[in-house]
Amino acid sequence: MANYTAADIKALRERTGAGMLDVKKALDEADGDAQKAQEIIRVKGLKGVTKREGRSTAEGIVLARTENNVGYMVEVNSETDFVAKSAPFVEFGNKVLDAAVAADAADLDALLAAEVDGKPISELVTETGALLGEKVVVRRVARVAGDHVAVYLHKTSKDLPAQVGVLLAVSGADAETAAHDVAVHIAAMSPAFLSEEDVPAETVENEKRVAEETARNEGKPEKIIPNIVQGRLKGYYKDVVLVDQDFAKDSKKSVGQVLSEAGATATAFARFRVGA
């Protein structure tokens, strides 16, 4: 019988993210040699790649950082939260983020073609999935540039790394504090657009049409319907447009007002939430 302890099993599980039964089988096959067992898990994982292709990857983490006034953010996914919080998966996520920064990647195709340690990210994805015994994916990347870029990462569970991330670019010499506060606001309130001008015209027209039809169905006088439509459109903007939203820390002010008082202007943002 192979000579290994419960501590050996725990350590190998933490290194590989593999299940307990798979770890014990690998240690048995390797006569208790942890390095050999890790290689056995990796090889068996590679053989199972095709079987994992159709599996759902609803768990994961978000990682972000800035470099020379440019913010980069990536979302990487796994099948289970056990793997998502494992050291190998977090290391994988950091390598993906490093590649995004090095390649100045602004879209997923550019990121997947980027290299880490002499190999493309797409190959690293396959190897990591083999090691962990789960399907892993690089879901998306964001690049935001500006005079100042704030980064905010939020943990939705104390047991997991960050699963919500925000990049916010602002202009203005003394905008750091306001930028951080607004980044936290974005994480909580999930705006869809930076300004009213960013809302697609067809979306605006649809909101107007719905508001008009609703007003008529409610029997409102025809002469006041245009005012009702404008009022409801304003309410829609307040829900989805960042600068129009009530500021989370002080609902008496809009986000736009908070930025203006700090001498700042928001120029771009990105928000990721795992699975959303």
Swiss-Prot record:
PANTHER family given in the database record: ELONGATION FACTOR TS, ELONGATION FACTOR TS, MITOCHONDRIAL
Keywords: Cytoplasm, Elongation factor, Protein biosynthesis
Protein name listed in UniProt: Elongation factor Ts
HAMAP family found in the cross-reference section: EF_Ts (MF_00050)
Subcellular location: Cytoplasm
Function: Associates with the EF-Tu.GDP complex and induces the exchange of GDP to GTP. It remains bound to the aminoacyl-tRNA.EF-Tu.GTP complex up to the GTP hydrolysis stage on the ribosome.
Gene name linked to the record: tsf
SUPFAM superfamilies, A to Z: Elongation factor Ts (EF-Ts), dimerisation domain, UBA-like
Annotated Pfam families: EF_TS (PF00889)
Family: Belongs to the EF-Ts family.
A GO CC term assigned to this protein in UniProt: cytoplasm
GO molecular function, one term: translation elongation factor activity
Residue ranges, annotated region (Involved in Mg(2+) ion dislocation from EF-Tu): 80-83
PROSITE patterns for the chain: EF_TS_1, EF_TS_2
Species the sequence originates in: Kocuria rhizophila (strain ATCC 9341 / DSM 348 / NBRC 103217 / DC2201)
Highest rank taxon of the organism: Bacteria
